[in-house]
Amino acid sequence: MTNIALLQSLGLFDARVPRYTSYPAAPVFSGAVGADFQAQAIEALDPAVPISVYVHVPFCERLCWFCACRTQGTQTLAPVEAYVGTLLQELELVKQHLPAGVKAGRLHWGGGTPTILSPELIHKLAQAIKAVIPFAEDYEFSVEIDPMMVDEPKIRALSEEGMNRASIGIQDFTDIVQNAIGREQPFENTKACVETLRRYGVHSLNTDLVYGLPHQNRESLAATIDKVLSLRPDRVAIFGYAHVPWMAKRQKLIDETVLPPDIERHELANLAARLFTEGGFERIGIDHFALPDDSMAVAARSRKLRRNFQGYTDDTCPTLLGIGASSISKFEQGYLQNTAATAAYIKSIEEGRLPGYRGHRMTEEDYLHGRAIEMIMCDFFLDLPALRARFGEPAETMVPRIAEAAEKFTPFVTVDADGSMSIAKEGRALARMIARLFDAYETPEARYSQAS
């Protein structure tokens, strides 16, 4: 039996499982955990330990059909200006609970399209954030950039405010693919954007691609990757397209009949992995690549890689503070998501209330299962002695789960003499399915994307 046939027999192309960018996954969050928890968690922060800050800008001038992110379209700047004003109000509410001296080791603007902001709004928002949570000495400020919605004045403003890493969404450069997903983005515009970023001193660059898109094939993806390599990014993520039109209504505009079949989709992922590794990148986890001297590659080699809502990260900050509609915070005590609908989020802020509306209070069992899953997703290795050292006797509950994984996913999963579990290189596409065996929560499969 070929490797791909064996993976298919194990259910790789049928399973729908979490991406495990958090544990527990967001569908487990409950309305029983809200703004009071949010306030208490902020008040408990240690000023000596830098935090990460995520700011969500949900607006886009165009809504790409493939996207399942929390976004909304606008053709004018008026709602964006009003929203930035609300972000500033939220920062003031956070400030009321924030211990003096807390600093940001990481700041990330995501969306949506953060570069829909005018230069004036960029300055206004960045300065308001830094007034409440100043940068730590060795900070990273990254921004998601749409090359079709950015110009030199915006890049200059971001650079002046301290942006030192840019994340550029690409998806695919092929015309027929772009037309099929409602996204126009010529390579020439992207190249010009990258050149401008570097001219303004932004030398750390991430690019995001997607495989499994309509009309995508080996030739078109290879051509896209060749162009991406010419841009010389430090990191690349290539995510599998999640076709969930029952959740993301705009995906109904995509013709399902021209989506690549399961096996071809898997081969596209393998092709991308081969081309990027041949291009000098190291493979990171299930869907990221980084140059050998990049901090993410260094973290992966030393088993210090972590998962967060952006995917893989080398961020060592234990706290993620989410600002903006639908943003999610991660505290030592658990997770908290802000109100998702922009209008409801604004109403909460205008009433002087923190906007947290659902979350999850972590238990010691959650920490154990979460760390086991993170090891699987990041290292393809579950270090049982390390779990025993950290969690003590409860770590023994992992033993039957390890045995189940080894039995169910033979020959890709093996158990070492000390009880640790390893996933073979040929079976790493199964990582999310294997991680599911260590998930203590049952949630409907329809909420998740295809495992491959």
From Swiss-Prot:
Listed GO molecular functions?
A: 4 iron, 4 sulfur cluster binding; coproporphyrinogen dehydrogenase activity; coproporphyrinogen oxidase activity; metal ion binding
Question: Where is this gene product found?
Answer: Cytoplasm
Q: Does the keyword Isomerase apply?
A: no
Sorted alphabetically, the Gene Ontology cellular component annotations on this record are:
cytoplasm
Question: Which controlled-vocabulary keywords does the entry list?
Answer: 4Fe-4S, Bacteriochlorophyll biosynthesis, Chlorophyll biosynthesis, Cytoplasm, Iron, Iron-sulfur, Metal-binding, Oxidoreductase, Porphyrin biosynthesis, S-adenosyl-L-methionine
Q: Catalytic activity, per the record? A: coproporphyrinogen III + 2 S-adenosyl-L-methionine = protoporphyrinogen IX + 2 5'-deoxyadenosine + 2 L-methionine + 2 CO2
Tell me the route in metabolism or biology where this protein functions: Porphyrin-containing compound metabolism; protoporphyrin-IX biosynthesis; protoporphyrinogen-IX from coproporphyrinogen-III (AdoMet route): step 1/1
Q: In the record's cofactor note, how is the cofactor described as bound?
A: Binds 1 [4Fe-4S] cluster. The cluster is coordinated with 3 cysteines and an exchangeable S-adenosyl-L-methionine.
Binding positions (S-adenosyl-L-methionine 2) = 66, 112-113, 171, 183, 208
- Gene Ontology biological process terms in this record: bacteriochlorophyll biosynthetic process; protoporphyrinogen IX biosynthetic process
Residues that bind [4Fe-4S] cluster: 60, 64, 67
Q: Where is the Radical SAM core domain?
A: 45-278
Q: What is its EC number?
A: 1.3.98.3
Binding positions for S-adenosyl-L-methionine 1?
54, 111, 144
Give the protein's cofactors. [4Fe-4S] cluster
Q: Which Gene3D superfamilies match?
A: 1.10.10.920, Aldolase class I
Keyword Transmembrane (UniProt): no
Q: Which residues cross the membrane?
A: none
NCBIfam families (alphabetical)? hemN
Q: What does this protein do?
A: Anaerobic transformation of coproporphyrinogen III into protoporphyrinogen IX. Dedicated to bacteriochlorophyll biosynthesis.
Name the family: Belongs to the anaerobic coproporphyrinogen-III oxidase family.
Quaternary structure and partners: Monomer.
| Listed name of the protein | Coproporphyrinogen III oxidase, anaerobic 1
- Tell me the organism: Cereibacter sphaeroides (strain ATCC 17023 / DSM 158 / JCM 6121 / CCUG 31486 / LMG 2827 / NBRC 12203 / NCIMB 8253 / ATH 2.4.1.) (Rhodobacter sphaeroides)
